[in-house]
A protein has these predicted regions:
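Short structural boundary motif marking the start of a folded domain
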Residues: 1-6
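Short polar catalytic/cofactor-binding loops
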Residues: 8-14, 45
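Short Gly/Pro-enriched turn/cap motifs at secondary-structure boundaries
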Residues: 18, 29-31, 62-68, 140-145, ...
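Short gly/ser/thr-rich secondary-structure transition/capping motifs
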Residues: 19-25, 56, 143
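Glycine-rich beta-strand-centered segment in the early N-terminal region that forms part
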Residues: 29-45, 55-106, 111, 119, ...
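Cysteine-cluster motifs in flexible loop/terminal segments that predominantly coordinate metals
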Residues: 95-158
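Mid-domain Rossmann-like dinucleotide-binding core that forms the NAD(H)/NADP(H) cofactor-binding site
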Residues: 151-152, 158-241
């Protein structure tokens, strides 16, 4: 199928990006999903610093590539081997899909899946290869197996988390990275326990969710630190939100 997407073809554009326009909106061709893949109509896509790191070249990825890994959408087509999803399901995307078979997955560390990391670094899905082509038939890479800065995207079953339809999809998109990364850093990496004292440095999207993750974990004292003048509204959110 054909749709539009934000394609990055070169890195190192000058800032501000609003003027240099490093992304081009192009018509792309999506191949049908494989047996363990789904086709999703994109509802929301956040701009994460990881996207900016690909644009400025500090996070090397094969080019060209369709960016976007923090998003949400509605499933419109399901691969033949998938039995636990249905068309019309609302979903949030996770950029850390797991194969369930590699050493890291078997050790209980699916978020560090070796297969997903290897294929993602090559701009491919876990089933191998890309499902994206440009108007001339040339291959375009996937970003973290997601590429949600587009009207539609094909991704692995492991990248899909079904959410209740009562949750607005535009809001749910943030769970795909900012919420998962911030709360996960506190709960899974730092392993904060009830009564612990926690300091969070920086109150962007990830930091705010780190604070909320610390509260969820039962931290006895939470210290939020940010020197940016624009952070005052974030402090208000933490006080009264």
């Amino acid at each position: 199928m054909k749709c539009r997407a934000a394609v990055l073809r070169t890195t190192g554009a000058e800032k501000p990006y609003a003027e240099s326009q490093p992304l081009s909106i192009e018509e792309i061709e999506l191949d049908p999903p494989g047996p363990n893949e789904v086709l999703v109509k994109i509802a929301g896509a956040g701009v994460c610093h990881s996207d900016l790191s690909v644009i400025n070249g500090s996070r090397a990825r094969p080019l060209p590539i369709v960016l976007g890994h923090e998003g949400s959408g509605e499933i419109v087509e399901i691969g033949s081997a998938i039995t636990d999803l249905k068309e019309g399901d609302h979903t949030v995307f996770q950029f850390s899909a797991a194969c369930g078979r590699c050493v890291r997955c078997l050790e209980g560390r699916p978020q560090n899946c070796f297969t997903a990391a290897t294929q993602g670094g090559k701009g491919e899905l876990m089933g191998g290869g890309s499902r994206i082509r440009d108007a001339d038939g040339n291959t375009i890479g996937h970003h973290s197996g997601i590429s949600c800065m587009a009207e539609y995207a094909v991704m692995d079953r492991g990248s899909i988390i079904v959410v209740d339809k009562s949750v607005p999809l535009a809001d749910a998109a943030l769970f795909g990275c900012a919420v998962m990364t911030g709360a996960g850093a506190v709960i899974n990496t730092a392993r904060v326990r009830s009564g612990d004292k926690v300091a969070v440095l920086g109150l962007g999207g990830v930091g705010l969710n780190g604070v909320m993750g610390a509260k969820l974990a039962g931290a006895g004292e939470i210290i939020a630190i940010d020197t940016d003048a624009h952070a005052e509204s974030h402090f208000d959110f933490l006080r009264y939100g």
